[in-house]
């Protein structure tokens, strides 16, 4: 008896998920493998994926469009939270996993599958994100993870797949692992495992090299409504179109590359290369607009919550009670975050040069040092006396 009768496999067309199809059938005795490829903006690589899965042994190959849901229900909440894992990574890959988990469970219930599967390895973060995301949707369903158990290196997995007629777009001598969606690309493995190895230019796709960027700067205006980006340069755009346009504009100026050593969920450090042009400028612009529209105490408290939020996403806890509670807090803070932020893009930098909002609590006649100054200067001395009282008492007690 096999591990399961019918399995829905999260399928990307890459090495691990492709090898999972024959492995599930020949090694684990699964009778039917249904593949599900979530279209989250991968682009051309999704073209042949349906037939590739069928050629690899799948009985049904599904490609489902999740782009709108991905941006609206996952990316936009992350932007509201200014979510950057370890203050750098805008979580492009991590945000996709809970949605894919949700889609897997939907497909399993539709097709009567008794298990779902993924191709994540035992060292990665995605195994945690998929397993927890799946179990949050259906705690009774089996979760199979062949790559966590088969013990094959990437080169051995390629050889195994080739025995069953599979072909791969990577070379055994330099097998980069690449994940792509609308929010960005992640690149790892191969020579990049040496943290001193500079990434070769050919691994980048979304963000131009500085030497290839325009010599003249470009100004970019992003409009927000209640924390959600809705306009680019005065043009109202839907979620998918907005992210796509920003990726193109920002990436053209060499903005959005990230090279970092990050701390994985399983306790190891890994070297990761990311491209995420739209998300990088959206988080920066959104944070700046908050500085114009939120009070100091709310802003300060929210910054701590943002770190928690980022860690929850990274660690696979999207559907957790704490994540839901933090969501409620962040949503409340966004009622006033409406306005426009202006950025200057040039040679790898996105510098914020202006912002405006009808909800602004910046008051020019209180901030000015000119003749229009309405700040009550006489109140400063009394304020300092009260504010400094604990310091003065402490100093006297410690003479």
UniProtKB/Swiss-Prot annotation:
ATP binds at residues 10-18, 38, 119. The keyword Transcription does not apply. Pfam families: Arginosuc_syn_C (PF20979), Arginosuc_synth (PF00764). It catalyses: L-citrulline + L-aspartate + ATP = 2-(N(omega)-L-arginino)succinate + AMP + diphosphate + H(+). One of its GO terms (molecular function) is argininosuccinate synthase activity. One of its GO terms (biological process) is argininosuccinate metabolic process. This is Argininosuccinate synthase. It comes from Picosynechococcus sp. (strain ATCC 27264 / PCC 7002 / PR-6).
């Amino acid at each position: 008896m096999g591990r399961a009768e019918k399995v829905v496999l999260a399928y990307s067309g890459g090495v691990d998920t492709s090898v999972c199809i024959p492995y599930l059938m020949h090694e684990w005795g699964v009778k039917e493998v249904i593949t599900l490829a979530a279209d989250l903006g991968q682009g051309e690589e999704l073209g042949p994926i349906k037939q590739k899965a069928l050629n690899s042994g799948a009985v049904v190959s599904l490609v489902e469009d999740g782009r709108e849901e991905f941006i609206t229900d996952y990316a936009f909440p992350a932007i509201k939270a200014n979510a950057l894992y370890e203050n750098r990574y805008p979580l492009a890959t991590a945000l996709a996993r809970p949605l894919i988990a949700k889609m897997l469970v939907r497909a399993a219930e539709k097709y009567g599958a008794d298990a779902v599967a993924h191709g994540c390895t035992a060292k990665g973060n995605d195994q945690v994100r998929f397993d927890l995301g799946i179990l949050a949707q259906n705690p009774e369903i089996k979760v199979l993870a062949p790559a966590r158990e088969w013990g094959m290196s990437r080169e051995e997995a390629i050889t195994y797949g080739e025995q069953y007629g599979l072909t791969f777009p990577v070379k055994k001598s330099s097998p980069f692992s690449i994940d792509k969606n609308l929010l960005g690309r992640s690149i790892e493995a191969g020579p990049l495992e040496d943290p001193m190895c500079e990434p070769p230019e050919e691994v980048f796709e979304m963000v131009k090299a500085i030497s290839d960027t325009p010599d003249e700067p470009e100004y970019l205006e992003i409009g927000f409504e209640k924390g959600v980006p809705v306009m680019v340069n005065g043009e109202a755009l839907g979620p998918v179109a907005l992210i796509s346009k920003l990726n193109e504009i920002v990436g053209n100026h060499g903005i959005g590359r990230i090279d970092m050593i990050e701390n994985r969920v399983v306790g190891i450090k890994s070297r990761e290369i990311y491209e995420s042009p739209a998300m990088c400028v959206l988080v920066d612009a959104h944070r700046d607009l908050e500085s114009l529209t939120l009070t100091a105490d709310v802003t300060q408290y929210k910054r701590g919550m943002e770190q928690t939020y980022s860690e929850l996403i990274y660690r696979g806890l999207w559907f957790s009670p704490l994540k839901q509670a933090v969501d409620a807090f962040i949503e409340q803070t966004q009622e006033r975050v409406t306005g426009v932020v202006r950025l200057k893009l040039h040679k790898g930098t996105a510098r914020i040069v202006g912002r405006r909002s009808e909800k602004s609590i910046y008051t020019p006649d209180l901030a000015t040092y000119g003749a229009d100054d309405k700040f009550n200067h006489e109140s400063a001395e009394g304020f300092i006396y009260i504010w400094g009282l604990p310091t003065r008492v402490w100093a006297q007690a410690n003479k």
